[in-house]
Amino acid sequence: MKKILNKPENYVDETLAGLCLAHNDIYRQPQPRLITRANSSDKAKVGIVTGGGSGHLPVFTGYVGEGLLDAAAVGDVFASPSADLMADAIRAADNGQGVLLLYGNYGGDIMNFDMASETVDFEDNIRCTTVLATDDIASATPEEAHKRRGVAGMIYGFKMAGAKAQEGATLDEVTRIAQKTMENTRTIGCALTSCTLPAVGHRSEEHTSE
């Protein structure tokens, strides 16, 4: 695949800036690495926030919009966003009805979102609930399903929770439908080659075809 990068170290920031310039009717970037809805509803509704490392487009920023997510915090490629950035994403999504945090089952994301949730609860009195996406059946056995990663299946959670929030449902109602969706979603992915990190410039691993 051909790709054009100005400087690999600027890949994430330039990608997000380009996204907002190309679709300024949908996206807004109030600060670096934070994408929110450009035209939020005036009515009070439950906010929905996600976040994670870059390199998985259109996740996460591509699902910010009406009936979907209200904000997404973005880290470096394959790296969790900071807890401070996640807290700012929660604040940006808050409409006074609480905020659902819906993201993948990764250690760094869990740690930072937990800290962000505690911060906004203490400093801003924002109530948050959390639903983890654990749809990737290739990453753990059924007996250890709680260890499974969240990948493409979380998109269904974004849509179901986002639609419920848009209807004016409570935080508990939005959380329940997101949890039910994730509990009933399974995915598996495959790739023909290993990935290439922009800052490295070559494949992370080389595999011999069987």
Please name every model-derived segment.
Residues 2, 46-53, 69-72, 98-107, ...:
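Short glycine-rich or small-residue beta-strand-to-loop segments that form or flank ligand, phosphate
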Residues 32-66, 73:
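Glycine-rich, flexible N-terminal cofactor/catalytic loop recognition
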Residues 17-28, 69, 73-74, 91, ...:
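Generic secondary-structure signature for well-ordered alpha-helical cores
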Residues 131-184:
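Short alpha-helices
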Residues 110-124, 144:
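Short Gly/Thr/Asp-enriched flexible loops that form oxyanion-binding sites at enzyme active sites
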Residues 205-210:
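Conserved small/polar residues in nucleotide/adenosyl-binding loops
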Residues 56, 65-96:
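Glycine-rich oxoanion-binding loops at beta->alpha junctions
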Residues 1-48, 202-204:
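N-terminal amphipathic/basic leader segments beginning at the initiator methionine
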